[in-house]
Amino acid sequence: MKAGALELGEGSKTSIPRGGVNRGISILDFILRLITIIGTLGSAIAMGTTNETLPFFTQFTQFRAEYDDLPTFTFFVIANSIVSGYLVLSLPMSILHIVRSGARASRIVLIFFDTAMLALLTAAASAASAIVYLAHKGNAQANWFAICQQFKSFCERISGSLIGSFGGIILFILLVLLSAVALSRC
């Protein structure tokens, strides 16, 4: 083949059919949704079951830390639960995209709701990470002391639940990008 033939667009005429690529994208979309369910549901369960009681107490006070002591953590649990529920409900639509890779309208709906759930998850994880930072470091100017020196198990669990949630955010970004690529190829 001459170099001039390539410049004229007479190169290899073989190409991958669009349906096959879209089917591969749809399978990857389904797998990413399953992994995201595990991350967000795990984060909600880890945060929702977090509590610790210190072994010492005064005559009137027992020192205890629970996730529902702070409204931000409650919002975090609710948001992760909503996102997990949405992901479970979106699995049939993802299966539909594997079977019918040219389904355009349902992909648009998924992009819209995936973006909304991404925003909700980002808001919850960001708010919770600010409180986790205060729990670890405190704020001397506001007279807020770090509690993680006393409540070690509590702080380890709330920090771990943030990891799953931020992993879910990254996977949601990939889901939106994959849906956009699949939509552009329809």
From Swiss-Prot:
TM regions (residue ranges): 27-47, 75-95, 108-128, 162-182
Cytoplasmic-side segments: 1-26, 96-107, 183-186
Keywords on record: Cell membrane, Cell wall biogenesis/degradation, Glycoprotein, Membrane, Transmembrane, Transmembrane helix
Location (main, coarse): membrane
Listed Pfam families: CASP_dom (PF04535)
Recorded GO CC terms: plasma membrane
Glycosylation sites: N51
Parts of the chain on the Extracellular side: 48-74, 129-161
Membrane topology designation: Multi-pass membrane protein
Origin: domain of life: Eukaryota
Annotated localization: Cell membrane
GO biological process, one term: cell wall modification
InterPro entries, alphabetized: CASP/CASPL, CASP_dom, CASPL
UniProt similarity note: Belongs to the Casparian strip membrane proteins (CASP) family.
Subunit note: Homodimer and heterodimers.
NCBIfam families: A_tha_TIGR01569
Function text: Regulates membrane-cell wall junctions and localized cell wall deposition. Required for establishment of the Casparian strip membrane domain (CSD) and the subsequent formation of Casparian strips, a cell wall modification of the root endodermis that determines an apoplastic barrier between the intraorganismal apoplasm and the extraorganismal apoplasm and prevents lateral diffusion.
Stated name of the protein: Casparian strip membrane protein 3
Species annotation: Vitis vinifera
